[in-house]
Amino acid sequence: MSSESEKGQERLIQAAKLFSCHIQDLVSFINRFIELFNLTMKTQILPMSLNEESCIKDFLEQMIENFKEMQLMADVKQKEMQKEPLCSKVVTEVTSAGGKCADLSPHHMAEEMLKTIQTSGAALVPKTSHILGSLETSLSLLMQFPIMGLRLSDFHSEETKEQPDATTSEKSRSPECPKTTKEEALKRLQDMLCPENAHKPLETAAEELEQFIKTMDMTLQVLRKSIKTMEGNSCVLTQVQGK
C-alpha cells in the first residue's frame, strides 16, 4: 500500500471512530431528553438502546416515532391547559393556596402567579413542543444518508461484549457474530460512501464521512441546547414545587 493510500486509510479509520462516538453520544443525549420529558410531562417513556448489531437507521426510525408520540402528548397537555383561561386558573390557585389574597402586595401576587404558572407546566409545554419538532427534523435529515443503513459494528472491529446495555439473549448470540476485521470495516465503509471508479476511494470515503459527521454535529447541538433548556425548566419546576 502506498503512503497516500495509508494516509487515506488512517483518515477513514479516524472518521469512523468519531462517527461511532457521535452515535453513542446521540443515544446518551436522547435518553437524557426522554428522562427530562418524563419529568416535565409526568409520562413514562422508556429509554432507547442501541447494540452493536442494530441497524442505525432502524434506531433513528424508532426514535422519530417516539418523538411523534411525545409531540402528541405535549399537544394534548397544551390543549388541556387551554380549556381553562390561565389567568382564572392562576388566581383561583393562588387564592385557595394562600387564603390571604387581599393581603398580598402586587409584587408578591405576581411572584405567586409566576410560581403557579411554572408549577402548572404552562411555561414548559410550548417550549417542549418546539424542541420536539426541531429534533424530529434533525433526525429526519440524518435518515437521508445511505450510511445510516449500516450497523454500529461496521465502523470498528471491537467486540460487542463491551456493550453495557446488551441483553442476556444478545450476549449469548455474540460468539456467533463474527468479529469485524479492520479491512472488512474499511471496505464496507468505502463501498457505502465512495462512488464507483473514484480516483482516491479511501480519501473520498473519508471526506464523505467527515461531511456527514458535521451534519451530525448540528443534530447533537440541537440536543445539547434542548437538554440545557429543559434542565433549566426542570430545575425551576423542582424548586417551585419544593416550596
Swiss-Prot record:
UniProt-listed InterPro entries: DUF4533
Positions of region (Disordered): 157-181
PANTHER family: CHROMOSOME 12 OPEN READING FRAME 60 (PTHR36289:SF1)
Full protein name: Uncharacterized protein C12orf60 homolog
Record organism: Rattus norvegicus (Rat)
